[in-house]
A protein has these predicted regions:
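STAS-like cytosolic regulatory interaction modules
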Residues: 1-53, 71-163
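Histidine-anchored nucleotide/phosphate-binding helix
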Residues: 65-69
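Residues immediately C-terminal
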Residues: 56
Length: 163
């Protein structure tokens, strides 16, 4: 079994995404594809992100989660929920300002039997770089702390594109 997976369920425009294991850069194309398909669904109202079984999450993934949260708020006016039961992950999402775009819940969801695993998509190095750049620009747009934290990374990635 892989050390990571993304599970999904949907009912009446409410999506549930559960992240299991180490959610890192290797899943950015899979996650971005999922975010795009969800946000293009005309019935999409909101999303519940479950990180209760997430061991590691990187800033690229956080940027893509911010993207879907902002889309939910724009499309329906509903603030999405994020479940985080691990203190380290809760601290990271708090430091990124996620409490301004998510309702943060510290209790795990009890029933997840309807979730289906999302297959991992392979991506080229350029596609991964593009997703990393987009995700970090989203994080930078959330607050000044994130802007300061990621400006050098974004600058370096933009220089690689033009170089």
């Amino acid at each position: 079994m892989a050390g990571y997976k993304i599970l999904q369920a949907q009912e009446k425009g409410i999506y549930v995404l559960k992240f299991v294991g180490e959610i890192r850069l290797n899943l950015c194309s899979t996650l971005d594809n999922l975010v795009e398909s969800i946000t293009q669904d005309p019935s999409f109202r909101t999303v519940v992100i479950d990180l209760s079984e997430t061991e590691v999450i990187d800033s690229t993934t956080l940027g893509l989660l911010a993207k879907i949260a902002l889309a939910a708020k724009k499309q329906s006016g509903c603030t999405p929920s994020l479940i985080s039961t691990h203190p380290d992950i809760t601290r990271i999402i708090g430091s990124m300002g996620f409490d301004s775009i998510f309702i943060i819940v510290s209790e795990p969801v009890s029933s997840m039997e309807r979730l289906e695993e999302i297959p991992e998509l392979k991506a080229s190095e350029q596609q991964v770089r593009d997703k990393v750049l987009e995700a970090h620009k989203i994080l930078m747009g959330m607050n000044g702390r994130n802007r300061e934290e990621f400006k050098n990374l974004v600058h370096a990635l933009e220089c690689e594109e033009t170089g």
